[in-house]
Amino acid sequence: MTDSSPDASPSSLKIYFRLLGYVRPYIGLFLISIVGFLIFASTQPMLGYILKYFVDGLSNPQAVLFPGVPYLRDMQLLQAVPLLIVLIAAWQGLGSYLGNYFLAKVSLGLVHDLRVQLFNNLLTLPNRYFDKHNSGHLISRITFNVTMVTGAATDAIKVVIREGMTVIFLFGSLLWMNWRLTLVMIAILPLIAVMVRTASKKFRKQSKKIQVAMGDVTHVASETIQGYRVVRSFGGETYEQQRFLAASQGNTDKQLRMTRTGAIYTPLLQLVIYSAMAVLMFLVLYLRGDASAGEMVAYITMAGLLPKPIRQLSEVSSTIQKGVAGAESIFEQLDVEPEVDRGTVERASINGHLEVRNLSFTYPGTERQVLDDISFSIEPGKMVALVGRSGSGKSTLANLIPRFYHHDKGQILLDGTEVEDFRLLNLRRHIAQVTQHVTLFSDTVANNIAYGDLAGAPREDIEKAAADAYAMDFIAQLPEGLDTQVGENGVLLSGGQRQRLAIARALLKNAPLLILDEATSALDTESERHIQAALDKVMKGRTTLVIAHRLSTIEKADLILVMDQGRIVERGSHAQLLAQNGYYSRLHAMGLEEPAPSGIA
């Protein structure tokens, strides 16, 4: 993508015209606003002509303004000039209202549409996109960038139409009055065009940097707010203050650079315009000819009205460049292919037989193979525990089953059907996940249990799921029970309580295949007991793949797969693996999990 202006760069024009396509649903309102701005622009030359009649009327106020118009042939300048001024003001007010109000409706609708489309698009993007982009920049696109884009698509159009038509009407009137003098004004237009093009390149480049800097500010603020407990626990206040100060200062510096560019550019443009005006006034005085005083005053007045709209037209380049830079990042996200879903198979229900054959996987953009020739099978209702050091590939394997990522080689079969052949939504309806990083939403306890496809579940089913997850004991003590707000990400609940709500959510889903990533965080004895009982309940009768950290869970597994560096190095029951006195036995002696060696992610 080049940094040239929309006037010069085909790529920028393409972006801008694509952006204008979002105005199409509001074309009726948009046309009304254009009519309003045309009305407004038409009043500018009228003011010049009124001054002509006013000056001429000073010497003969009884002169008739419209001698050839019926009903008006007797109206003298004395009555006509004041009346016309009032009528022109009313006409201008009507145009201003139509233009500004209806364009505001278009602008607000455009903001809404773009934000909704961006948010909806976020929900369809593949996991790898979130791996490469931090949340601050994604949020900044929805908030800051959309505002910049709307300015380019609507506010800039307002200036271009209103001020552009004003310039055209004024130039037309000036040419009609004295075309020779008007050519002097037209002679400076090429110089103005060169200045606008040069400034546009700078504005576009600086706008991109500002949007990145604004994303950095949002990112730091978002991270600090989400992790405020860690910040306070580890005395990170000073570090975060410095980090935010640096991000905010970087944004301020870039904003100032853009302001400085405009502050230099606008006075230079004014100097060029007023220099042309000075030459024009000299020629008016020198070449007056047989023109009346009123005609000369009208001509100079209309010429004097030109610098303001010309300056605003030149300054709109800044708004357009900000919008084009913002639109570029927005369209970059909108153009990302959504999650791959080429499957056609839909099953109303499955038994839960899971088989993995010769599975290998490498994360996109990396070379290290995370999974290497993995094979195992789980019969319906059985449990397989994945055990291994951190970074051995356990979580990656679990993420491939619901197709958060797509495997390179091998097969993952669910009831004999490759998971890639399922329709994505249908596949995930058969899978429930409980991860160690519990996500709760700023809503009620009940709505967090009955989330997504589960919304609308009968109240008794929600209560049963909560009871089976051993969560009703603490829910009953909450101020409003199941209708209590849990705060952002369940901040008002303890770690054990949040985990039990996640288990209740999985129980309510009642999926035949459960993927469980046990929490490694230390909990009090009572919470540990409740969670273990809840896990026993949720795993009962379901095919379960568990990333196990608790010895009690591992001992209950029908099959234990011991993983190291992406491979299954041992398999068997707890007793069998201990008897082998191998890798599992060593992990067991060290507490079942040891740190990953250097270089293992």
Swiss-Prot record:
It is found in: Cell inner membrane. Keywords: ATP-binding, Cell inner membrane, Cell membrane, Lipid transport, Membrane, Nucleotide-binding, Translocase, Transmembrane, Transmembrane helix, Transport. It is an enzyme of class 7 (translocase). InterPro entries: AAA+_ATPase (IPR003593), ABC1_TM_dom (IPR011527), ABC1_TM_sf (IPR036640), ABC_transporter-like_ATP-bd (IPR003439), ABC_transporter-like_CS (IPR017871), ABC_transpr_lipidA (IPR011917), P-loop_NTPase (IPR027417), Type_1_exporter (IPR039421). GO terms for cellular component: plasma membrane. It catalyses: ATP + H2O + lipid A-core oligosaccharideSide 1 = ADP + phosphate + lipid A-core oligosaccharideSide 2. Residues 354-590 form the ABC transporter domain. Residues 31-322 form the ABC transmembrane type-1 domain. The chain crosses the membrane at residues 27-47, 83-103, 174-194, 267-287. NCBIfam families: MsbA_lipidA. In MsbA the ATP-binding domain (NBD) and the transmembrane domain (TMD) are fused. Belongs to the ABC transporter superfamily. Lipid exporter (TC 3.A.1.106) family. This is ATP-dependent lipid A-core flippase. It comes from Pseudomonas fluorescens (strain ATCC BAA-477 / NRRL B-23932 / Pf-5).
